[in-house]
Amino acid sequence: MKRFTAILLTGMMIFTLASCGKKAQDTPTEPATETQAAEKVEMPTETEAVTEVVTEAAKETQQTEAQQEEQTAEQPDEEQNNSGDNNSSYQYVERASYENGESVSLNPSWQYADHSAINSGCAVMYKATANRKNIVVGVNAGHGTSGGTSVKTLCHPDGSAKTTGGTTGAGATKAVAVSGGMSFNDGTPESSVTLRMAQILKDKLLAAGYDVLMVRDGSDVQLDNVARTVICNNAADCHIALHWDGDGLSYDKGCFYISVPGGIKGMEPVASHWQQHDALGASLIEGLRAHGAKINGNGSMAIDLTQTSYSTVPSVDV
């Protein structure tokens, strides 16, 4: 998992947002402030700056990984016992290889693929043309699946209930396959803004030598949240989902990432990866902070997400 440290802060260097966050609820927000913020996204142009910040993030995260590896070596039996029966179906997989421009569909043999309800669409792989780092960043433009609210999928692979609220309330065992997201007061849907963000992020990542798996490469993709996550699990080294927060506020409350709540940290595959999820999110937020973006509170909000519950690579909603 060392490779994921190199991309921890690449994303944060590339998109400086005025407001982004948890799975957006269908609550309208003030348009002028947020829409203008989307148009004024500032992009760094110096490769040296990107390299410097990525290196700083890598050092911090490598320390976290080293601590995890040391703990695992010291207490293998205890961790195995704590995982329980849920761990028996968990699988580590090698990243699948795809050519530039190749469509990436959901392989029904992939772990958790059978939990998906909408999966006829495809992601698209883009390869950097120079200074390639052999790292694939999964970029997920939130929402943008027509019919996504008409079907539901299991919140957790093991069928257990959600432990926190969100778009779907705590205690539910199923959630809408893909929520519709919020709308700005001028009528612009969240999915349009997240797509533009994803396109900008893709271009900057490619220019910096990172390959990009565009989970949604157009206005609509027939891939639900489970399918998007499973595809990233198998074709990317990390998974970054972009969102705007439907909070109804008329001011910019700042950026934050969705951290993993304690209630699901013992469930696989979360148990094996939640520290990496949170490390990725924290690094993105600290990078945004360093480049002048407003941060909401401590920069995180713990929410039980479908994406996190199914992720086997470092994964975060921002």
Where are these regions (language model features)?
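Catalytic-site microenvironment of enzymes
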Residues: 4, 14, 21-61, 65-318
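Bacterial N-terminal signal peptides
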Residues: 10-16
